[in-house]
Amino acid sequence: MNRPGDPTVEELMARIAALQAENHQLTERVVKLEEELALARLHRFAPKSEKHVDRLFNEAEQLADKEDAGDEDDDLVELPDTGFPPTDKPQGKKRGRKPLPEHLPRERVEYDLTEDQKACPCCRHQMHRMGEAVTEQLHIEMKAKVLQNVRFKYACRHCDRTGINTPVVLAPMPAQPLPGSIATASTLAFALVHKYVDGTPLYRLAQAFEQAGVPVSRGALGHWVIGSSERHLSRIYDALKLRLRSQPLIHGDETTVQVLKEKDKEATSTSYMWAYRSGEHSDDPIVLLDYQPGRGQVYPQTFLGDYRGILMSDGYTAWRTLNSATHIGCIAHSRRRFVDALKARKKGGGPPQQALRFFEQLYRIERQARDKKPDAGETQADCIHRLRQQHSLPVLNALKSWLDDIAPKVVPDTKLGDAVSYTLNQWDYLTRYTSDGMMPIDNNLLERDIRIFATGRKSWLFSDTVDGARASAVVYSLMLTCRACGIEPLAYLRHVLSELPQRATSADITDLLPCNFAKAAAARSNIDG
């Protein structure tokens, strides 16, 4: 019998239910925080490369039965056998020093015995030279010189004697990239490559000039960068942008950049470099960065306009607002979420391991499809499409069934829950690549280009002004496009910074685009050969 004031059974049951709900919420929060702590430790102390991820995956696969016995073993399923042959293990790279390139000029430095050393130590007769021992070393030296541009003046003595006033005629010289500047096209190219290819901040580049006995201020270097971009290189950028819009396939992504002096924004705020790239097998490889202050949908819409081709991107909704494009998703983004879920686990194995097994099989099929010789009358794209339909689709169907099965069982607000939710929500986009052999499976091609920008960002940290950020976008775009075309950035910049000042703003510059520069260089090489 309850005493007066004691809670009723219903009230006690309600309290128990509330405590149980609170305990469940706290348990989920603890799981989430433990995952975040585990990932933070990995990001701080462990390698961040995919090789480290593969080590985690392999260890988890080997130890799954021992360490993860229990209910989760029910989630492990056999992968479908599509009849695809196993992948041969790639041969390791040969070790050892590579020979010095044959195209480098050779300079002989000879060492001979003195006359008294040429006498035989045994009989003291004169020894004869029987050969030579040659070793090669790489010698690099930096040289700076001053070009004196001497322009001869001419006047008419006959007119002078007759009292006729005639002007002095001065010999012309080619237009310079930055009129009034001490920098030649070669010097500008040198500075741009050091900053945007080697990732050298301007203050360190100024120090390097100082150490070489050529004092150049950081402000002058900044003027060289922005001036080269605004006056000349932006013309190449605009031409590449027009060509990119006509590509059948475009990769899209974005990454952060900080600009200190930007109107209506704090110095610590985040701006963005939007990245665009043509397909891997395009005849005109193009990589463009576009600086913008935000991450809204208006930026890709403005850049690409009514683009009607294939657009590869991650799950960010701004890309999907381009209604005219055919959108495909990035399998690698989904895979990385399961990688994070595997890293966050206290023990290996479980559902993250199972998911990675599916992805591994999908990528194995891609590698073999890419290397397979097409059948008679079949294009490479047709061959890839056929193999995807035959082998990739069964794996994807099995993955979808498995995800549908485990989705109700996982805690939503965890790394595994995020991975499962993302993959299911993006499923139509992630699997669309199987419908066309021209479509890539992921966005890794562009992400490798962005990684070069991100590496440089670690050195120079931020852009001081908006003009500097836009100049960086232009120069990085040309450097990355040169890389995609397989041409040397320094040689390319020397050429275009010498040639563009000679051409009117409305002149045709098609021959100066990186892809055409590469074709011309290849043609010259064939002629010389």
Give, region by region, the residue ranges found by the protein language model.
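Short, flexible loop/hinge motifs at secondary-structure junctions
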Residues: 1-178, 182, 251-252, 313, ...
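Catalytic center-proximal scaffold of phosphoryl-transfer enzymes
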Residues: 2, 88, 117-119, 128, ...
